[in-house]
Every structure is written in C-alpha cells, then in structure tokens.
C-alpha cells in the first residue's frame, strides 16, 4: 500500500478552496446572455468550443491531488444538477463557490462548522419553499418558447423549434436532438408509433421505387414467438384473404420455409401480407409488443399468457388506418385500440418511469410512453462547421431539458431575480444559536452570486445592479442582453423552477460537507526510478 499524505484544518481547506476556485472560475465565465465560450482540448480531433457549464467542469483535472479533490467535489454539483434538471449547472457551481468561500472565512474566524452547516440547511429548506410559492405554471407555447430561448443562450430559433416540437408530440412526447446534414435547423415529426424493424423480405415491398410497403386499413397479428410452421397461420391467412384486406405480422422471427410461403402468396396476390421482426430484446420486447397490441386493439399472442398461435382467429387481430414499412422501420398510424386501454397502459409506464433506477431504463420507458401518447419529434441541428455543430447541439440539448423542467415544475423570473426575491423568506428565520444564524445570513448573501456573475460577464458593476433589483419588487430585474431593467417575465427571461431549486439544493449540500471538512488524505506519488546508464559500444578494429 502506497504512503499517504495528510493535511489538516486551514491548510486542507485552503487547498480544497483553490481547486474549487480553479474549476468555478472556468465554468462561471459561461453564465448569462453575455457569457463567453470555453475551448476544450481533445486527445483526438479538433478542440471543442462550448458554453455549457457541465461540459467545462467535466474536462477539469488538476495536478495537485488536494486541489483536485476540491474541484471534483464541485464537479459533482454540476453533474448532479444536470442529471436532475438538465440545466442550471453553472448557477449551481457559482452558488457552491460563493457558499464555500464565505463559509471557510467564517470557520477561520472561529464559527462552529457544524452549526454553520445546520444554519445553511435550515435556510435552504425555507428558500426552496419560497421558490415553489413564486413558481407559475408553464403550459402555453409562448412560455415554453421563452424558456427554450433563454437556455439556448438567447437563440430564438431554438426556442421556437422546441415549442413547435412540444406542440406536435405533446409534453410527454419524445424529442431527440441530432446533427443535421444542412446549414439550417429542421424539425421532423414521426406520427404514430414507429419502431426500428423493417420487413423480413424485400419482396413484401409494394412500392418498388421507394422500396416501401404501404398497407391501408390492415389487420395486425402480434406474436411473441418464432413462426416456423405456416399451418399455424392458415386460419388467419384464409380469413384475411376473404376480407380483401392486408395483414401485418409482427413476430420474434419467421423462419425460411414459412417466410417463403408468405412471399409467394403476397406476390401472387392471394393475400397482401408483410412480416416484420418484433422490436427490442427479452422482457423489453414483450413490453413493446404489449404496447403495440394495446395501440391497435390486438390480442397479444404469447404462450406466457396461455395463447397459442394455432388457436388464434380473426377476433385476435388488431387494425390501424395505415401502416408503412421500410427496410429499417415500421410505422403504425392511427391504431384502433380503445382510448381507455391506451390511457391505462400509459399510466402503467409512467409508474415504471417513477420507479426506474437507471437513466437507460428511464430513457427507454420514456420512448415507449411517447410512442403510445403521440409520436417522436427529431430536431436536426444545422451548422457551417463541425465545431459550431457540437456547440449548438449542446445548447439545444440544454434548452430541451430546461423546457421539460419548466413544464414539470413551472417557471420563475430568470436572470437570478427569483433567488433575490426569495431572500424575504429568510426574514425572521433564526437558528438555535448565533453560529446557525451566521449560516442563514451566509446563504442570504450567497444567493446573490448568480446575478452578480451575470452582470460581471456583461461588463457591468454587480453591486449597483443588485442594489437596484433589491430596491424593487416582483419580477423586476436586469436584462444583461441589452443592459436594461424591467419585468423579467414580460421580457421573456424565465428560469424553470426545478433548475433553480436543484442548483440551490445541490450547491448547499456540497458546500455544507466541504465546510465541515477537517482533514484530507491523498496518496504520495512515488518518484520514478532513474534510467540506468547504457553500456558503451565496443570499438571496431581499424577505426580511429
């Protein structure tokens, strides 16, 4: 086991603060409408230019191990805020730095760190309640557009794209961000339910030019097994043939002999049919097949549910107004499932999302929810260069997360004003002793830091602006984009309540832990052994 170095008290806290300041100073230059970019060196490819706080924080590793500990702890604030709210990482970092700087000064002056932390925790709980009281619902397209615009660094086109996407697929719908192929931003909306499985044979294609299969008002059979014997399908095929309608088969697989029979019957015009593989794998496949069955009004044919393929008849088939199948995707439009059954299924998925432990599971459940409840919107980001593309895609991602957070918990006045207005909730709040009171006063001052940083990044005098904002009431604040004062909500400068709340809670939590740190332990790097000298080369005869 390698030897360890131990730092105590003021020496440990000073090192930790140096690391925090290095990281926070790099992150906070990105805050506000006049925040600057940060260039990140990459081990391969061109450098990345970004204005995304969490991207900057993730890149920082310091040489001094004790300073690096401080930086990594504050990096956790940014990452956690991004995970929970999707935005607000820079605000969280600025708050953590302000709290820690003032907190360590107080500890050095002899204030008890544990009571200081208790005071901060007490004040944080009161501020969170006040932020929720100040919050207003965000449901109309204009508010959604404004939140998206602010989070995308005042880019109105991005705000409008997100508002349009939400209007088309609903607030529960899946909206994804991809790199586009052109210079302009685009919005593509996939109506109905789409899954990434295409036809099992190109001979099912009805449109030879586009190689697509278009089925109007088809029957839909959903099976959770491989179809190997065509005899199992005969009752269904005969019934569909008599009806004169088409049939879409969704199964785990269709083996070669059965597939060949289906292709031949399709080409001869005996029955118009198309077979596709079921989407997903394992339990997720079964869940997705049940979703499709609910959407189309079909009975899910599964041996787990004591149903065999050979026992199925026309009553077990679902329908949809239209189905389009390509070599890669299948889209079911306007399924004939009962609205009550679909709503019930949606509620089950929502409950599963609430209980999901991993981000991956949550994302997949969210996709299933969207496919059942409306569709999928894809925002394709356009740019001239690859560097601009990456930077813009980060901003659009931030804006999308912010608008989702706004829809979930509502909005408050932006530009740091909500935190200033929440200060009044601390009036009359007292702790059990003077040291706790100092913690409350410390947080009251620290929550001015985001507004001060926005003003500093815009080249203004922060104390003058903060005093001007505090002298007024309501949504009155400072618009750093054009150096004016006014009603922040009317000017469209809004922050999601969830983002502001998460930033405050995570910053206060981490700062409290760091203030109460008394020792730091790090590994001592062993000096690399010197290289041995190489042996001399023997001379050759006859050489001088």
Curated annotation (Swiss-Prot):
Cellular location of this protein? Cytoplasm
Which SUPFAM superfamilies does the record cross-reference, listed alphabetically?
GroEL apical domain-like, GroEL equatorial domain-like, GroEL-intermediate domain like
Give GO terms for biological process: protein refolding
Q: Where, by residue number, does ATP bind?
A: 30-33, 51, 87-91, 415, 479-481, 495
**Gene3D superfamilies documented for this protein:** GroEL (3.50.7.10), GroEL-like equatorial domain (1.10.560.10), TCP-1-like chaperonin intermediate domain (3.30.260.10)
Which reactions is this enzyme annotated as catalysing?
ATP + H2O + a folded polypeptide = ADP + phosphate + an unfolded polypeptide
UniProt keywords, alphabetically: ATP-binding, Chaperone, Cytoplasm, Isomerase, Nucleotide-binding
State a single Gene Ontology molecular function: unfolded protein binding
Q: Which GO terms describe its cellular component?
A: cytoplasm
Kindly report the protein's main subcellular placement as a broad class: cytoplasm
What protein family does this chain belong to? Belongs to the chaperonin (HSP60) family.
Protein name as it appears in the record: Chaperonin GroEL
């Amino acid at each position: 086991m390698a030897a360890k170095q131990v730092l105590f008290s003021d020496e440990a806290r000073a090192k930790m603060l140096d690391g925090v300041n290095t990281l926070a100073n790099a992150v906070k230059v990105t805050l506000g409408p006049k925040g600057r970019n940060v260039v990140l060196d990459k081990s391969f490819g061109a450098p990345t230019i970004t204005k995304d706080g969490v991207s900057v924080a993730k890149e920082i590793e310091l040489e001094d191990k004790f300073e690096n500990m401080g930086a990594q702890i504050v990096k956790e604030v940014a990452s956690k805020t991004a995970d929970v709210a999707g935005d607000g990482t820079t605000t969280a970092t600025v708050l953590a730095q302000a709290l820690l700087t003032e907190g360590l000064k107080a500890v050095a002056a002899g204030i008890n760190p544990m009571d200081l932390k208790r005071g901060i925790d007490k004040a944080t709980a009161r501020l969170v309640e006040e932020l929720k009281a100040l919050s207003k619902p965000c449901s109309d397209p204009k508010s959604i557009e404004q939140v998206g615009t602010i989070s995308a660094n005042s880019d109105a086109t991005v705000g409008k794209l997100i508002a349009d996407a939400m209007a088309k697929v609903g607030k529960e719908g899946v909206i994804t961000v991809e790199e586009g192929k052109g210079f302009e931003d685009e919005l593509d909306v996939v109506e109905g339910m789409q899954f990434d499985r295409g036809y099992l044979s190109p001979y099912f294609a009805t449109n030879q030019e586009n190689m697509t299969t278009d089925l109007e008002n088809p029957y839909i059979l959903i099976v959770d097994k491989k179809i190997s014997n065509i005899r199992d399908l005969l009752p269904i095929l005969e019934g569909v043939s008599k009806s004169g309608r088409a049939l879409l088969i969704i199964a785990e697989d269709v083996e070669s002999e059965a597939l060949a029979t289906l292709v031949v019957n399709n080409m001869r015009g005996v029955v118009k049919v198309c077979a596709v593989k079921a989407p997903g794998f394992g339990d997720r496949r079964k869940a997705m097949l049940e979703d499709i069955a609910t959407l189309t009004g079909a009975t899910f044919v599964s041996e787990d549910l004591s149903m065999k393929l050979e026992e199925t008849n026309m009553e077990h088939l679902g329908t949809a107004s239209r189905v389009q199948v390509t070599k890669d995707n299948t889209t079911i439009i306007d399924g004939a499932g009962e609205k009550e059954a679909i709503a019930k299924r949606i509620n089950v998925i929502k409950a599963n999302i609430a209980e999901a432990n991993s981000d991956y599971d949550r994302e997949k459940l969210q996709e299933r929810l969207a496919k059942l409840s409306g569709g999928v919107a894809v925002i394709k980001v356009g740019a001239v260069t690859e560097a601009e593309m990456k930077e813009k895609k980060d901003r659009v991602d931030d804006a999308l997360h912010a608008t989702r957070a706004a829809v979930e918990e509502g909005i408050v006045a932006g530009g740091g004003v909500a935190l200033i207005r929440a200060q009044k909730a601390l009036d009359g709040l007292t702790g059990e002793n003077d040291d706790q009171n100092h913690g409350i006063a410390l947080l009251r001052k620290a929550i001015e830091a985001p507004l001060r940083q926005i003003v500093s990044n815009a080249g203004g005098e922060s104390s003058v602006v903060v005093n001007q904002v505090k002298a007024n009431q309501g949504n009155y604040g400072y618009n750093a984009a054009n150096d004016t004062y006014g009603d922040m909500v009317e000017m469209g400068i809004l922050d999601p309540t969830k983002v502001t709340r998460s930033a405050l809670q995570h910053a206060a939590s981490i700062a409290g832990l760091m203030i109460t740190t008394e020792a730091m332990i790090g590994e001592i790097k062993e000096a690399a052994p010197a290289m041995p000298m190489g042996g001399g080369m023997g001379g050759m005869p006859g050489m001088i």
